[in-house]
Each structure stands twice: as structure tokens, then as C-alpha cells.
């Protein structure tokens, strides 16, 4: 938004303060200023001069030598203009002037010196057309020696305000509103208030009819006669041009002028056009779907039912608050008009803008929410401006219409301690009263409590709560005057959040050490997906209207991870993903919600493939990854047990069991296995998937038990050794049985043992499987000898034989 300093000076003496002080106060206490620039400063180098003499150029038939006088000295100009004569007042660009990309210099034309250039309106960028030199004879205030900038009222500073910073302040979207704010901040008086304009309405002028309804907060119309349409006076033209508004004629320009001055849009209808439709009967109503009519911008959009219209005799003449109709607009022959001044619901205007795609200066102000009681004062001010702009025989009827939302007092109660505590300063009652009364609030005190009456131009959506008053006081005092001091607080060791700490460790280990990718999924899924793991009858149904595929809260992370896998299965040969999420059950607390850590690994083939050795190796590899994570957080006491879960392949699933709590009871911490082929098919998965799911709270509990026990052992400086041993065990027998027996032998050098491969078929007896174990040996005192390694190997072989295991 552009604001003219000269225009605002009509209301308060800003020019007495100085530009730097104004800009500083605006930046600190009001809003952001994008720029503050002089308007057309180059025109200071163009003066009004009088032609003293004319003579032919001795060497060029189409040129003339002109002697001009600027009030203090004479100059010689060579020109090709043919429309000038002695005594004419014309604009002269003196040497040093820059007009566009052209710089005026002293020069010689065919041997004759020329000290400047006589200019047309086009050369001064005042018009798109220029037929010869601009003749200023008879124009008001066209005086010899005056600069064109001063003559055109262009001697001004234009502020460009960042609109986003005043979206909440509709009272600042006008010159008077902004000047009023600056007067409050700079302790200046208001010398003229346009809202206090007076007008004697004429009872002889026929009244228009306005149909009352609830589609507007306020709507008034006045019938005006004695109108003459011609170009606006230079003051009106210059002020509109400086604010980036196109000049049209003296009537339409007043409508734009009063909007920029007071922030209240108005509209003028051609009265004769309205009367041709029948008796004038204006109404605010909604459009019919597909309805259209020609607008001022030459468009005729097909309207939706949510668009608000102004109708006369049921026929549309304007889109309310957005744009007027072309046929009802003021014409050059117009002698009578009907003036509209209204305030519409901001929500309605926003819908009209969205529906039509039309965003005008009027609609920008309406969508912010205007004060409904300003409509009548604006009519009186507009009538005065019409008269000032040339309509000297003006007569106007008493405005007719309605006001549905009269001014309601907004009172805010607070106390001095609240204000000082929020600002971090100590203000007295006098300080607070001074600031608020300068901002036009009315303050009354009862002890340390105060009651504040909000001015009517601020109570709409703006100042409504005590915190708003704190902001008003703080910005007016100046945030730069509030001393910055560090917050003083007792330094305490933060409470350790084990859940968050372990979650971070887990994410780091799986993402960095094991190369998994973390995924995030919604907690909503379908009732059918809840059937895969758990009792679907325990599903928690979402009360909101949701599509069937998002109708319940999930009871497992499996469906989400399988869908992630399906999305990526054609892009990657191997997928390793994990997720931390919550699952929900229709059970009493605390069983109604659990935090789960789960992962899915998709490899090359489905679990129906005959290469069982490869399947076993992959499974053992993932199992080893889980064990390495448990070891990284110092959890060593656990076992894997076979357990049948419907989501897993019958022959490939384990549960992780550990002792936890004071009673030391065994509890299931999680599950690991190949996802059942039927489930893979239902999710359209082409590859086999290993899925692991663990109750995170159980892992946290185990970690908390074990983290307090120091298990650090200095790494051995001697090479480690490994022993591999393959034995036959029952097809359905737990492979951990043998490793548990080995642990009971308490071999001092034995660090750990694990299954690294399994095999069935071939020459392995039916009902049996070949299991290969690997044992890691560490000696902290000496290098292993072959004899010692053989002793340990023989001890393991004897142990296997004693317990009925056959060597392979």
C-alpha cells in the first residue's frame, strides 16, 4: 500500500517532525516500511518558462530558436515544435535533467546553442500521447519559474507499507487512519478529521429505495443531482497518481479518493440507468448459479451462488464490495448519481474474491473487516469532495438504508501488575494512562485495576483482550526502550528421559550401523488391516467421518510397513525400513496404547522359494542384527523361543523372551519372522519380507535394569579365534538349546556363540536339520595356541555327544 506524506499532513502536522523521525517511529511502533521515496524528483529540473521571442533557424527550415524567461534569467532553446508562440507558458527541461533514460545536456543544433528542451506531456511521462509542446496557458497555478513537480503537486514523499504487517489493522488502510496512528505515536494534534464532515441534505431530491436484509452489516444510498463529469482537479489527480490509482473523471476519482483517505469503499451508480430499470430499489442478495453481467474490467464471469451482488429491481448492477457493473457506471453524460456506502461481512467478500478471482482495492479493505458505523460519515465527506472537485451545484438526498451492527462498547479489565509483568518494565498508572489515551482509549482506574474502553475503530477483531493492551503499550513506549536482561533461573540437571534417549540410540544404530531407513505413517488404517494382527474387535473406531481405509486406529505397524515395502519394491532390490509408532486398543488404561518399534526387510524372493539355505541365512542375518543392537545397549540376558503367530510363516518365527521387573518373570519383548505368504499376497508383494516388532517400553525397562551395571572390559591385545561346529538337531527343536548348554560349561575364553546357518534336505536325515554354530574365543593374557583351540573344540564335541547331538 502506498501512502502520501503530503496527504497525511492534511490531518496532522507531520512535516514539522522530520522524515527520519517519522520512519523510525513507524518501524519501531507501527509496521514495516518497504520504501520511502520522493515522487518524480526528476521533475524538479523541469521549469515553467514564458516564450519571449521566436525566430527561424538559419540552417534548418524545421527548427526554431526560442528565447525563454524562467522568472530570473533568459535561456536560448532550439526546438522543432510548431505549436508554440510568443507569450506561451511551456515546460523547459534544463541541462542535467533526466527524463527516462535520456539526459538533457547543453548542445548545439546546426551551429546554434541550445540550453535545454521544451517538453511535451509524453516526454514528461505524464501521458501516452503528446502532440507538440505542452502549453500551460490559463492552467491554475501555472506560474513562470515554478517547477513542474510543484505545479503538479508531485512534491511529496511516498511510503510503501508492507501489507502483511497491517493485515490485523484495517484502521491503518487509509491516509487518515495512518496519520491518526502517527499523531498518537509522535504526540501530534489532529487538525482535521474527515469523519466529522458536515452536509446539508436536500429534502427535494427523490429518495432511492433500499431493501433491508441480513446480507450486509450496513448499507446506505443517497441520490445526488447537479453532477457534471469532467477531468478532476490537479490536486485530486496527483494524489491518486501518487498512490498508483488510475485517474478517470471527477466523480469516479472522488470514490477512489475517499477510499484512500478514510479506508471506506463507496460506489457511484448512474441514476438514469437505474431508473430505466424501473423505480430504484437496491438490494444485497446472492447470485444465481451461472448468472453473469458485464463488469468495469470488461469481463463477464459466470458467478457461483456464494457471490454477493447488489441488485436493482432484481437485476445485478455490482458484485458487492468487489467491482461495479459496466452498464450502471458513471458516464461522461451523467448528471445524476446514486451513491452507495456499505459494509459487508468480510467472510462473504472473501468467498466472492475466491470464486471470481477478482481482487480490487475495495475488496482488500472489506475482507479485513470494517467498522459498520462509518458508512454515513463517508457519504458526507464524499459530497464535500465532489463539490470541491468541481460539482458546485450538488444536491443530495438524506441517505436511506440500514445498520444491523451498531457500535458495541468493548471494555477490557486488567491491572498494572499484569501489564508490567508482561512487558518486564515498571510503568506507573500515569504512564499507562498517557499511552492509552494517546491511542484514543478511555481509561478508568480503581486502585491498581483499570477498565479500558476500546475506540470503535479498533474493536473489530483487533483489541479485545488484556494482552492486546500490553502490545499497544509496549509498541508505543518503544520496544527499543525496554532493557534487555537475561532470564534468571535456577540451574538444574535436566531430568533424564530414558524413552527419548533410547529411541535416539535405536534410530542411530539401525539407520547408521545397519543402514535402515526410518519411515513415518499415519495411525489410521482400515478395519480389515486390523484383522492381520490381533483381535479386530478391539479396534478403536474414529468418530469423525473418514473413508473406510482410514476408519480405525491401527493395532499393528505391520500393514503400514508392508505398504511402504510395496511402494518401493520395484525400485530397490533390497528394502530395510523401520518405524517408531503407537498402536491402539479398545481396552482400559494402560493397555489401550503401546509404543512399538518395528522393522521390515524385503529380500529377493518369497518364502515359498525352495532355497531354504538362503532363507535361513537371511533370517539368521537379521536375527544377528537384532542381537547386535541389544548388545549395544547392554542387554545380554534373553532367549529366542519358537512361537506360532498368525502373521508369520509357520516354520520361521521366533519370540524374544527376557526377564524383567522385580519379580524377574519372563516376558515376551517382541517377535521376529517371515511374514506369512498369504499376507504378502494380500498386499501384492513380490518379495519375501522379514518383520520384527518389539514393545518399546519393555526394551526401555530392560535397558534401565542393565545400564546401571558396568560391563566394560578392556579389549584384548591378542588375536581372537573362532570355532565352527555343525550338529544335527530335531527339525522343530530350538537351536538355542545347544548354545545354552555351552554357556553352562563356563569356558573362560568363550565370548559368545550363535547360529550362522541351517540346512534341511539332501543327505540330512528326515525330521532333522543341520545347524552350524560359530563360537568366538578371546584370551586377555596370551595368544591362542593350536593346542588350546583343539582342547576347547574337543570339549564342545564331547558336550554335544553327551546330550544326544550327532556331529555333521
UniProtKB/Swiss-Prot annotation:
Molecular function terms from GO: ATP binding; magnesium ion binding; phenylalanine-tRNA ligase activity; tRNA binding
Keywords: Aminoacyl-tRNA synthetase, ATP-binding, Cytoplasm, Ligase, Magnesium, Metal-binding, Nucleotide-binding, Protein biosynthesis, RNA-binding, tRNA-binding
Main localization category: cytoplasm
Gene3D superfamilies xrefs: 3.30.56.10, Bira Bifunctional Protein, Domain 2 (3.30.930.10), Ferrodoxin-fold anticodon-binding domain (3.30.70.380), Nucleic acid-binding proteins (2.40.50.140), Phenylalanyl-trna Synthetase, Chain B, domain 3 (3.50.40.10)
Location(s) in or outside the cell: Cytoplasm
CDD domains hit by this protein: PheRS_beta_core, tRNA_bind_bactPheRS
UniProt cofactor(s): Mg(2+)
Sequence ranges assigned to domain tRNA-binding in this UniProt record: 40-149
Superkingdom of the source species: Bacteria
Entry-linked PROSITE patterns: B5 (PS51483), FDX_ACB (PS51447), TRBD (PS50886)
Cofactor note: Binds 2 magnesium ions per tetramer.
Stretches assigned to the FDX-ACB domain: 716-808
SMART domains, per database record: B3_4 (SM00873), B5 (SM00874), FDX-ACB (SM00896)
GO cellular component: phenylalanine-tRNA ligase complex
EC number, as in UniProt: 6.1.1.20
Catalytic activity entry: tRNA(Phe) + L-phenylalanine + ATP = L-phenylalanyl-tRNA(Phe) + AMP + diphosphate + H(+)
InterPro entries with a match to the protein in the record: aa-tRNA-synth_II/BPL/LPL, B3/B4_tRNA-bd, DNA-bd_dom_put_sf, Fdx_antiC-bd, Fdx_antiC-bd_sf, NA-bd_OB-fold, Phe-tRNA-ligase_IIc_bsu, Phe-tRNA-ligase_IIc_bsu_bact
Annotated ranges, domain B5: 407-484
HAMAP family to which the protein is assigned, alphabetical: Phe_tRNA_synth_beta1 (MF_00283)
Family under the similarity heading: Belongs to the phenylalanyl-tRNA synthetase beta subunit family. Type 1 subfamily.
Name recorded for this polypeptide: Phenylalanine--tRNA ligase beta subunit
Organism phylogeny: Bacteria, Pseudomonadati, Spirochaetota, Spirochaetia, Leptospirales
Gene for this chain: pheT
Amino acid at each position: 500500500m502506498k501512502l502520501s506524506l503530503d496527504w497525511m499532513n492534511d490531518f496532522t502536522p507531520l512535516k514539522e517532525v522530520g522524515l527520519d523521525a517519522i520512519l523510525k517511529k513507524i518501524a519501531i511502533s507501527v509496521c514495516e516500511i518497504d520504501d520511502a521515496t520522493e515522487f518524480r524528483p526528476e521533475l524538479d529540473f523541469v521549469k515553467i518558462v514564458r516564450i519571449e521571442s521566436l525566430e527561424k533557424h538559419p540552417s534548418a527550415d524545421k527548427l526554431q530558436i526560442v528565447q525563454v524567461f524562467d522568472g530570473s534569467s533568459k535561456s536560448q532553446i532550439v526546438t522543432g515544435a510548431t505549436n508554440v508562440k510568443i507569450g506561451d507558458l511551456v515546460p523547459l527541461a534544463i541541462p542535467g535533467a533526466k527524463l527516462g533514460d535520456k539526459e538533457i545536456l547543453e548542445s548545439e543544433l546546426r551551429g546554434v546553442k541550445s540550453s535545454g528542451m521544451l517538453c511535451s506531456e509524453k516526454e514528461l511521462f505524464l501521458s501516452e500521447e503528446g502532440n507538440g509542446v505542452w502549453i500551460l496557458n490559463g492552467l491554475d497555478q501555472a506560474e513562470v519559474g515554478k517547477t513542474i513537480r510543484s505545479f503538479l503537486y508531485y512534491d511529496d514523499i511516498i511510503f510503501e507499507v508492507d501489507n502483511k504487517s497491517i493485515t490485523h489493522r484495517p484502521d491503518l488502510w487509509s491516509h487518515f487512519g495512518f496519520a491518526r496512528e502517527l499523531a498518537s505515536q509522535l504526540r501530534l494534534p489532529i487538525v482535521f478529521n474527515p469523519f466529522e464532515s458536515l452536509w446539508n441534505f436536500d429534502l427535494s431530491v427523490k429518495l432511492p429505495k433500499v431493501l433491508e436484509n441480513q446480507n450486509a452489516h450496513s448499507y446506505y444510498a443517497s441520490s445526488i443531482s447537479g453532477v457534471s463529469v469532467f477531468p478532476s482537479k490537479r490536486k485530486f489527480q496527483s494524489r491518486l497518481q501518487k498512490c498508483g490509482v488510475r485517474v478517470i473523471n471527477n466523480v469516479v476519482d472522488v470514490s477512489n479518493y475517499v477510499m484512500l483517505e478514510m479506508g471506506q469503499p463507496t460506489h457511484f451508480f448512474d441514476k438514469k440507468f437505474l431508473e430505466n430499470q424501473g423505480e430504484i430499489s437496491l438490494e444485497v442478495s446472492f447470485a444465481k448459479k451461472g448468472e453473469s453481467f458485464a463488469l468495469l474490467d470488461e469481463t463477464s464471469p459466470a458467478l457461483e451462488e456464494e457471490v454477493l451482488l447488489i441488485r436493482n429491481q432484481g437485476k445485478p448492477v455490482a458484485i458487492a464490495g468487489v467491482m461495479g457493473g459496466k452498464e450502471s457506471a458513471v458516464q461522461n453524460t451523467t448528471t445524476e448519481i446514486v451513491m452507495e456506502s456499505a459494509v459487508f461481512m468480510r467472510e462473504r467478500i472473501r468467498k466472492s474474491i475466491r470464486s471470481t478471482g477478482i481482487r480490487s482495492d475495495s475488496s482488500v479493505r472489506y475482507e479485513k473487516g470494517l467498522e459498520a458505523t462509518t458508512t454515513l460519515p463517508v457519504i458526507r465527506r464524499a459530497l464535500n469532495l465532489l463539490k470541491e472537485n468541481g460539482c458546485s451545484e450538488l444536491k443530495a438526498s438524506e441517505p436511506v438504508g440500514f445498520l444491523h451492527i451498531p457500535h458495541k462498547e468493548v471494555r477490557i479489565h486488567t491491572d498494572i501488575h499484569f501489564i508490567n509483568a508482561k512487558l518486564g518494565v515498571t510503568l506507573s498508572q500515569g504512564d499507562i494512562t498517557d499511552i492509552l489515551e494517546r491511542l484514543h482509549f478511555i481509561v478508568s482506574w480503581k486502585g491498581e485495576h483499570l477498565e479500558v474502553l476500546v475506540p470503535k475503530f479498533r474493536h473489530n477483531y483487533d483489541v479485545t483482550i488484556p494482552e492486546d493492551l500490553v502490545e499497544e503499550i509496549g509498541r508505543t513506549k518503544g520496544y527499543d526502550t525496554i532493557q534487555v536482561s537475561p532470564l534468571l533461573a535456577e540451574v538444574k540437571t535436566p531430568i533424564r528421559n530414558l524413552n527419548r534417549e533410547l529411541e535416539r540410540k535405536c534410530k542411530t544404530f539401525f539407520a547408521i550401523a545397519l543402514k535402515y531407513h526410518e519411515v513415518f505413517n499415519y495411525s489410521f488404517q482400515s478395519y480389515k488391516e486390523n484383522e492381520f494382527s490381533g483381535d479386530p474387535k478391539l479396534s478403536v473406531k474414529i468418530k469423525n467421518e473418514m473413508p473406510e481405509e482410514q476408519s480405525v486406529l491401527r493395532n499393528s505397524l505391520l500393514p503400514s510397513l508392508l505398504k511402504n515395502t510395496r511402494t518401493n519394491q520395484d525400485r530397490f532390490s533390497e528394502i530395510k525400513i523401520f518405524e517408531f509408532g503407537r498402536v491402539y486398543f479398545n481396552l482400559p488404561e494402560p493397555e489401550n496404547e503401546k509404543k512399538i518399534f518395528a522393522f521390515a526387510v524385503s529380500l529377493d524372493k518369497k518364502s515359498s522359494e525352495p532355497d531354504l539355505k538362503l532363507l535361513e541365512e537371511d533370517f539368521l542375518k537379521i536375527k544377528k542384527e537384532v542381537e547386535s543392537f541389544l548388545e549395544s545397549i547392554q542387554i545380554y540376558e534373553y532367549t529366542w523361543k519358537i512361537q506360532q503367530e498368525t502373521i508369520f510363516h509357520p516354520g520361521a518365527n521366533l519370540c524374544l523372551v527376557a526377564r524383567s521387573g522385580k519379580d524377574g518373570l519372563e516376558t515376551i519383548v517382541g517377535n521376529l519372522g517371515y511374514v506369512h505368504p498369504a499376507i504378502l499376497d494380500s498386499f501384492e508383494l513380490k518379495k519375501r519380507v522379514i518383520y520384527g516388532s518389539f514393545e518399546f517400553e519393555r526394551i526401555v525397562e530392560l535397558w534401565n535394569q542393565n545400564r546401571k551395571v558396568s560391563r566394560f572390559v578392556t579389549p584384548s591385545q591378542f588375536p581372537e579365534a573362532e570355532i565352527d561346529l555343525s550338529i544335527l538337531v530335531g527339525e522343530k527343536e530350538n537351536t538355542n538349546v545347544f548354545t545354552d548348554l555351552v554357556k553352562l560349561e563356563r569356558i573362560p575364553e568363550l565370548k559368545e556363540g550363535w547360529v550362522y546357518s541351517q540346512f534341511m534336505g539332501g543327505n540330512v536325515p528326515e525330521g532333522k536339520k543341520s545347524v552350524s554354530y560359530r563360537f568366538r574365543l578371546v584370551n586377555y593374557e596370551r595368544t591362542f595356541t593350536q593346542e588350546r583351540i583343539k582342547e576347547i573344540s574337543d570339549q564342545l564335541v564331547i558336550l554335544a555327544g553327551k546330550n544326544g547331538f550327532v556331529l555333521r
